[in-house]
From Swiss-Prot:
GO terms for biological process: cell surface receptor protein tyrosine kinase signaling pathway; modulation of chemical synaptic transmission; negative regulation of neuron apoptotic process; nerve development; nerve growth factor signaling pathway; neuron projection morphogenesis. The lineage of its organism: Eukaryota, Metazoa, Chordata, Craniata, Vertebrata. It comes from Chilabothrus striatus (Haitian boa constrictor). Residues 1-3 form the signal peptide. Glycans are attached at residue 112. Gene3D superfamilies: Cystine-knot cytokines. Seems to promote the survival of visceral and proprioceptive sensory neurons. It comes from the Eukaryota. The keyword Metal-binding does not apply. PROSITE patterns: NGF_2. PANTHER family: NERVE GROWTH FACTOR NGF -RELATED, NEUROTROPHIN-3. This is Neurotrophin-3.
C-alpha cells in the first residue's frame, strides 16, 4: 500500500472511503486465510501452515455456510487512521469477542409530508454500541465504559413525550 495524503493531515469522509478502497484493492479483505491457529495438548497455541488444497476446501465450505473470516490488518495502518472519528466505526488493533447486536434504525413511514420535511437532515435516532474496557459488546449492564474511556450509564428504556 502506498503512502497517500491521508498520512499528513485531517481525514475527511472521502479520504476514509479511499483508504477502505485501497485496502480492498490491495487484497487485504480477501477470503483466504493462509494460517490456522491450533491448540496442542498442553494448551499452547501454535500456528499451522495449511496446504493450498486444504485452504481452498475450507474457503469453499465457509462460503457455503456464510462465514466471513476475520482478516488481520497491519497495526501501523491503524495507527495512521486514529484521527478518523465515527460513532459507528472504531478502528482498533483488537477485535471484539462477539458481533454487535443488530438494531433497525429506519424510521416508521409517516403519511404527513410536513412533519417528514421538518425531520429531514436531523438524525437524533442513532443507537450506539457501548463497549466496556474488555472489548466485549455490552447488552445487560447499567453502567459501562464508552469508546473514549468515560464511565456512562446505560438506560434500560427511553421514554419520549409527555408522561
Amino acid at each position: 500500500i502506498q503512502s497517500t495524503s491521508m498520512d499528513q493531515g485531517i481525514l475527511t469522509e472521502d479520504s476514509m472511503n479511499s483508504f477502505i478502497r485501497t485496502l480492498i484493492q490491495a487484497g487485504i479483505w480477501k477470503n483466504k486465510v493462509p494460517k490456522q491457529t491450533a491448540r496442542t495438548k498442553d494448551g499452547m497455541q501454535t500456528t499451522v501452515k495449511k496446504t493450498e488444497a486444504e485452504a481452498d476446501a475450507m474457503a469453499s465450505q465457509d462460503t457455503r455456510l456464510g462465514f466471513q473470516p476475520i482478516v488481520s490488518v497491519d497495526a501501523e495502518l491503524l495507527r495512521q487512521q486514529r484521527r478518523f472519528s465515527s460513532p459507528r466505526v472504531l478502528l482498533s488493533e483488537n477485535t471484539p469477542l462477539e458481533p454487535p447486536p443488530l438494531y433497525l434504525t429506519e424510521e416508521p413511514v409517516v403519511l404527513n409530508r410536513t412533519s417528514r420535511r421538518k425531520r429531514e437532515g436531523k438524525s437524533h435516532r442513532g443507537e450506539y454500541s457501548v463497549c466496556d474496557s474488555e472489548s466485549r459488546w455490552v447488552t445487560d449492564k447499567s453502567s459501562a465504559v464508552d469508546i473514549r474511556g468515560h464511565q456512562v450509564t446505560v438506560l434500560g428504556e427511553i421514554r419520549m413525550g409527555p408522561s
